[in-house]
Design a protein with these regions (language model features):
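Extracytoplasmic catalytic/substrate-binding loops of multi-pass membrane glycan-assembly enzymes
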Residues: 36-50, 59-61, 65-80, 87-91, ...
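Membrane-proximal stem/loop segments at transmembrane-domain junctions that anchor or position
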Residues: 238-345
Length: 454
């Protein structure tokens, strides 16, 4: 089905290296989920509860109430995986993550050998994806990180492999629909595909037709869930009702760190506070089932941004810092937070053993932090380097750009914009890191060529 061209650079040594690296990557992921204890908390606990309810055939509910607080795709798919396996154990979810992670590595490799013929870029980027601490550790949590990255890798693969559009475009619409049902901001992703197509092909008619076809299929994929939400909540909710909730908590007069904050700590006028108290029944009702909050929160967030554009921009940059330049604290917090085995060891260790453990822990965390900062730095740098050419290409009928540049840049810019506006925290960098890995490899290749000319 794929039109494999001679440009695709598959050499025996490189293929052997990739297979060995793939096996090492899988073994590291399996080792992590079997040896590093963690507790599923907050969103991860909610996903497990939703998936368990699907497994038990009680529906997409929390505490017996219908809910659409988060995207439905991941917990629903996981619930059916539980049914297939006959249990709803956490280890089943973790093994599912490893399978998805393995498939993602294969897909990224296939994408890289189509994206570029440069060996250094292919194998540097693939090495980073296979061995990246984040991509190993997050197999340990019941969350959307591994799932959405798998879907996104398929979407990118379908963009770079050009075959019959009668098959290709519906497949893109299908997977983008799945991504939107996981993360609702992917409803805007058909525009990303259209921009990438336009910059490559410079055929406006084909670009518009492609956009329309992808958007239509995506909408058809989302439509049944939208209809379900209308039946349950009496209003149009395409995927979830937490966008206004997140938007307001991240953009209000009392927010100083650009991140989520408890409702009780967010600014609220007396009138708004009265509405909140009524909706939440003075704290007796969970925010996760209070779909009415979106209706009152979203206008308040928009109003605050209009009245405080400078403060909004400040929060946006703080969000980007928190997402891409705050190191890897999220790995400790989400993927290895069960400290009971360590606490038991600390009671019997000597002082020297405790010091050695603490030193090793800080050393490992320092290395992880440097990797994230390095990838993020090169990722942002590559966006900036290519920004001028891409902007000129958007308004030119003849200036085309290859996927090698547009795929990492446009996708990175898409996530950067989303996080700038809505919400940022370290674990949100997860799906972007594969684009940053490609950008890093491309930047290193540029540096190598520059040094050769000196």
């Amino acid at each position: 089905m794929f039109k494999i061209q001679n440009k695709m650079n598959i050499n025996p040594i490189g293929l052997l290296y990739s297979i060995i690296l793939f096996i090492i990557g899988i073994k590291l992921r399996i080792w992590w989920i079997n040896n590093v204890p963690t507790t599923q908390i907050y969103d991860f606990q909610t996903y497990q509860e939703l998936a368990t309810n699907i497994f038990l055939r009680v529906g997409f509910v929390l505490d017996g109430q219908p809910v659409a607080f988060q995207g439905m795709a991941y917990p629903t798919v996981l619930g059916y995986v539980y049914r297939f396996m006959g249990n709803a154990k956490e280890m089943t979810a973790k093994n599912f993550n490893v399978i998805l992670s393995a498939l993602t590595m294969i897909i990224i490799y296939l994408t890289l050998i189509k994206l570029t013929t440069r060996q250094l870029v292919i194998y540097t980027a693939f090495t980073m994806v296979a061995l990246l601490p984040n991509y190993i550790a997050y197999n340990n949590v019941i969350g959307t990180e591994v799932f959405i990255t798998f879907i996104l890798s398929v979407i990118v693969l379908l963009q770079v492999y050009e075959f019959d559009n009668r098959i290709r475009l519906p497949l893109l619409g299908l997977f983008i629909g799945g991504a939107a049902l996981t993360k609702p901001f992917f409803m805007a992703y058909p525009a990303v595909v259209a921009v990438i197509f336009w910059l490559k092909e410079k055929d406006l008619k084909r670009t518009l037709i492609s956009f329309a076809a992808i958007f239509l299929i995506m909408s058809l994929i989302i439509a049944p869930w939208t209809y379900r939400n209308y039946q349950k909540f009496g209003r149009l909710i395409p995927v979830s009702y937490n966008s206004g909730y997140v938007f307001y908590l991240n953009n209000n007069a009392y927010n100083t760190n650009g991140a989520w904050m408890p409702i009780k700590d967010a600014y609220a006028s007396p009138e708004l506070q009265k509405q909140i108290d009524q909706i939440l029944e003075n704290g007796k009702r969970s925010e996760k089932v209070a779909h009415e909050l979106e209706v009152v929160f979203k206008p308040e967030a928009n109003k605050w941004i209009r009245e405080n554009p400078r403060e909004f921009i400040k929060l946006g940059f703080i969000r980007l810092k928190g997402t891409f330049f705050s190191g890897s604290w999220d790995i400790d917090t989400w993927t290895m937070n069960d400290k009971r085995p360590l606490e038991a060891n600390l009671k019997i260790w000597t002082k020297e053993q405790r010091i050695e453990h603490e030193r090793q822990t800080n050393f490992t965390k320092g290395l992880r932090d440097m990797v994230v900062h390095l990838l993020s730095s090169f990722g942002f740098l590559f966006v900036l380097i290519n920004a001028k050419d891409i902007l000129l290409g958007l308004f030119s009928k003849t200036r085309s750009l290859p996927y090698e540049r547009t795929i990492p840049v446009i996708n990175s810019a898409f996530f950067i914009l989303i996080y700038f506006i809505f919400e940022g925290q370290a674990r949100y960098n997860f799906p972007v890191l594969m684009f940053f890995a490609i950008s890093t490899a491309l930047c290193l290749d540029l540096l190598r060529k520059s040094n050769n000319k000196i």
